Amino acid sequence: MAPEEGDQAMSHEDKAACSSLNTTSSTELFDGAPSSENERLRIRQAAVDAMHHGSPKIDPQIWTDVTSHLSGSTTIDARQRDIFFENLTVHGKGSSLQIQKTVLSALLYPIAYPVKRLMSIVGNKKPHNDRRTILHGFNGILNSGELLLVLGRPGSGCSTFLKSLCGYLEGLDLDPVSEIQYRGVPFRVMIEKYRGDLVYNQEADHHFPNLTVGQTLEFAAHARAPHNQVGNSSRDQYVKSVVKVVMDTFGLSHTYDTNVGNDFVPGVSGGERKRVRTDTIVGMNSIAETVLSRTSIAAWDNSTRGLDAATAVDFVRSLRTSAKLAGSCHAVAVYQASEGLYNTFDKVILLYEGREIYFGPRQGAVAYFETMGWKRPPQQVSADFLTAITNPGERQPQVGMENAVPRTPVEFESYWKNSPEHAELETSMRQYKMKTPLDSSEEIKLDEIKRLEQSNHARISSPYLLSVPMQIRLCIVRAWQRTRNDIPALIATAVAQTVVSLIIGSLFYNIPENTAGLGQRASVLFLAVLTNALISLLEITTLYSQRLIVEKQAAYAFVHPFTEAIAEVIVDFPIKLFRCLLSAIIVYFLANLRREASHFFIYIMFQLTAVMTMATIFRTLATVTRTIGQAMALAGVVIICIAVYTGFTVPQFDMPPWFGWIRWLNPIFYTFEGIVSNEFHGRHFECVEYIPSLSFEQGLSFTCSYVGSIAGERYVSGDAYIAGSYDYSYDHVWRNYGILVAFLVFFYVLYFWLTELIPGTTPAHEVLIFRHGGVLQRLVRGDLERGESIRLQEVKSLASEVHSSKAEQKNTFSWKGLSYDIPVKGGEKRLLDDVSGWVKPGSLTALMGVSGAGKTTLMNVLARRMTIGVVTGDMFVNGRELDASFARNIGYVQQQDLHVETCTIREALRFSAALRQPQSVSMEEKYNFVEEVIQLLGMQNFAEAVIGSPGDGLNMEQRKLLSIGVELAAKPQLLIFLDEPTSGLDSRSSWAICAFMRKLADHGQPVLATIHQPSAVLFEQFDRLLFLAKGGRTVYFGDIGKQARTVLEYLEDKGARHCGPTENPAEYMLEVIGGGTQGQSTSIDWVQAWKRSTEYNKLLGELDILASSPSNGVSADPYMVGEFAMPLLVQFYHVMKRDLQQYYRQPEYILAKFGAGVFCGVFIGFSFWKSDNSSQGFQNVLFSLFLLCTIFSTLVNQIMPKFLSRRTLYELRERPARTYSWKVFILCQILVELPWQTLLGICTWASFYFSVYGSGQSSQRQGLVLLFTVQFFIFASTFAQLVVAAVPSVVLGSMLATFTFLLCLLFNGTMQPPSALPRFWIFMNRVSPLTYYVGGISATALHGRPIHCSNRELRVFDPPQGQNCGQYLAEYLKTAQGTLSNPLSTDQCQYCPLRVADQYLAARDISWDDRWRNFGIFWVYIIFNVIGAVLLYYLFRVLPYIRRNRTQKSRN
């Protein structure tokens, strides 16, 4: 398109977008600078002063024009880039078809895969090509200042094309034959050196929720601010100016100091959040990307999704203005484009199953395909016509051209490559390559510009504008802002650590400074260092929460990932220092540790360094993994290794040689030895127990009964004690600290390096996953033989015929005076205000309005699905009040497609039909009806496909069809609600769904649907319109009329401008009431105009008639008035079957669970390999049980996210639809875990029991230990459900579970015998369920085993002269618990303090006689968990829901 044609094409749109300008016309805007130097200086000064609150708004287009002229035309011209691509071919990893994995297939894979490969080799078969071609040889040129419209159906390769243009190739493979250049700059050079000039704007939003909108945008502006700022203003002035212009432009000025927020952090509203990105403002999807990131090339992937028509047009017009003024070029993928939006673009590319079938001027696209032989239906917009060409079920050949037109993607591609238009494109490409050769001249120009824009110390080869120190400073500021904005989280963490420290300190309160406190001192130090270090596990969650943000900013060339990592470390240091000091002071002084200043500060120093080292280790683990599940699994391995090989639970001299080396790689080993040596060195502890008793003077013929004692001494040296107990030495203290610091430095360097080196998350590429045995053979051949993606049956017969079994409906749903208020800070906010209307049989009603008008809110209110707030007004079905069956008798297709990801489409539909259709209908009839729905929706080819998660399973279109199918399968008796059923779909799918809704309405089904961007043809499918303005107030309710004349005449009669014959009525209506990015002001009060209209009075009259004349539309059948269609037992059967199936089909969850349990068992078993019968051996056995308990936390944290995801599905979709009872839900969630937990208990028992206890015990003992182990795992699952049943999030549930588990673990008698507990804490030993678990197993396994002291444990002393050992100790041995090894010896008497394991257990209040009692008590705890989970779920999740419904009903 010629430049003058582009200006001409844009004149109307740009005038509309610039209509608010008072002093500068659009002609002035496009033709040059503002009319006078004074005007230019005025705007420049206003821009400089923009950081002052209360300054007037600055028009963004004039501001951009002025700043462009101030920057200099040379700079702008040099930065402008074109996109040239030739033979662009892109491959993806893996095939388009996969078979669903199950637990069995995952277990057999190590055997099945080698066998399969061997058979392939023997059979001389070609190995499967594990990649698929997504794009096939694309060609084209996009010049600077141009806009490219990317058209194609979902799955055609639009996203891949956009990513390829901007170098976002993670998970993709660019074929070597491909050539991409940017006005003489090669692809690789552009990506490496000028990455900030290429921006791919994906659909998902990622922000730091605790940053304000202003802070978020200022960071982006700082990162890309040129060193030579406009007009020589300071960097801060430039940033403030740009941010103010952007926020003024898109109506976000009022959110400057408001947190961005997310689903869990309060912040701006969903619509406003959609408009905010770390580099730009999206949602209105405006020019802010160019203003803030200053990109030359931008690709926008379906960025208009979810926006109303007026806002979508405003967004593209702003891109048009940017391209005109700054010379940028934009490629925009749009699935639903109106004619006005289509005409804004310069060029169009059309994709058909990964093949380019047209690239060229926008004006010639339609004519090209008409010349080819395709017929354009009347009133079909250009973009819809082009997209329809790629749909065999929609395109129509011209008469006589049926056999001449191409049909397959390959034929279309061949036709295109042999066309004159393609020849012209090839000529242009040859001329372009001659004009702009790939030499270094353009690169030199860019380097010169970048050198001017870069800071002084930035590398010229770096794509970043800021130097590394400047990036670090910028990231430090942002990290501090995030920390300051999230004070509650800091307080919560500090309080949690304080509470844990208080518990540990009080558990060992005032340890005596004699030998009775020796073991207690070591124990409290072990717990202190371990808990402080393990708190750092939260670093994994923190890193994953910001990972996508950091990756995106690196892609936009804002900051290096490692600079963000360095900033985090620096900002975290004072926080960690404060927490360490707080924890140390509490534990140190409560436990009465060594009260000397030097030793206290050495303790602090070790603890702080250990915490920072462990935090860095966990961050490194998070960096090298791709999912948080992988990171947590690795962290679990690290934790168990650290806990076992610290040197406390297994002393160095007892460590097995095969695992003993781990201690040298364990930072906590060096920390523990350092603080233990620091505590005990140079101290003498008075002995409190002697052998024999000191009843008289005995010279040197006695010894203290503690390790490290010397015959004749009345004290024990601290150095001797730690040497004898742990093989520690004070000489290692500073060596250990040096090693600890070395660990810290090493992991810092490794973490920073890996953060920069390792790519982050791999983007998901939608592939179909079929149930084993459910995939059609022709699909297998099509995919595996050709390596191409599967193309599913077109949705072509949605409106062809509605199933005959659908009875004609006679129900009318009406509402009058509906208002909805929600509580906000300082009062209430009204979201809906006096909304009235009806939906009658045979009518299709559209619900429209500007973004944020309350369309989804009204839909939820009408469906009685609001969870907060107060609804007032009346709702009736056939003049009757709504009863308990209303929710079940309607179909509600939500905007979010929520499904069980492991089910197939057929299974999901059958589940809905089985539980929501009446009991009187046989199961065979229900399943036959499901097959009708599958045929109706065109899903026969993939009915056995697994739903999967977004990006890994069904695509967006298929999910939307499934959501509709689930509601249809239920045979709703009253009406169907559809919330944004066409959102994210292409025009063909949108048309098919609307045509299907039309057919349902024609058969008597009342239908109410919200729509955002309807084309004129699609809009005509609706009979009636409810039009809302901001604030949830009615603008119009009534008939639409043919070609929308009824509603248009109403608006024009009230003062709106005339709607042109080529305008889209939906866009026109939104414009005249003040829609768009900034909500253009209007002089007409449309709400009051509606209240004064005759149409409003007719509405009220009709509502009165409907309310006063109840019809007999609702049956008296008990099914119609009951809350659920099926009895509880039937509900339980179907839900339990689905849940068991879901677990079996998620091997990653089951195998992770079993992997953790079995690894823990094997590792502990081999670490405590066949402990001997010494006192230390028995203590090792007890510690092995203590450490085995630590798997509890891993299991609980695995179960809770699973429970919450199922609860979300139930509470958002299945409970409101009254699919099944909450009793069935909670019971099935508890029971479905039990088979796997039982099997896990058996596997874990087998992996550790024989390693630790040997195989010589009786089968009765082995069986009882097995029962206790199975009990433990059942307790873990029921405990997880008890905790998570009532909490709103996994984070809170994890904190509660971890804290409760810590209490149970600390007070089970292992670390501190009950007799040594402070009086206050004795009850906790009895309350802790782990007391009975540890007591039961240890008593069963150790009862009756004799003790044979090792040489370290024997107490050695000489008898008096003239006596042997037996004579000397004869009286003492009558009452003593121990044994004398050498009674006849006259020197070196060897006394073992204990003779049998039961004596050791008795000190911990463990008895053989209590084993079955403990077994029974443990079951009581399990039963308590089950009852508690049911009760808590009812009290916190069900009862409030019931009360809300009752409240709404009473107010109605």
Curated annotation (Swiss-Prot):
Disruption phenotype: Drastically reduces the production of andrastin A but does not affect its secretion.
Gene Ontology MF annotations: ABC-type transporter activity; ATP binding; ATP hydrolysis activity
Subcellular location: Membrane
Listed Pfam families: ABC2_membrane, ABC2_membrane_7, ABC_tran, PDR_CDR
Keyword vocabulary terms for this entry: ATP-binding, Membrane, Nucleotide-binding, Repeat, Transmembrane, Transmembrane helix, Transport
CDD domains named among the record's database cross-references: ABCG_PDR_domain1, ABCG_PDR_domain2
Main location: membrane
UniProt-recorded name of the protein: ABC-type transporter adrC
Species whose genome carries this gene: Penicillium roqueforti
Top-level taxonomy: Eukaryota, Fungi, Dikarya, Ascomycota, Pezizomycotina
Gene name as annotated: adrC
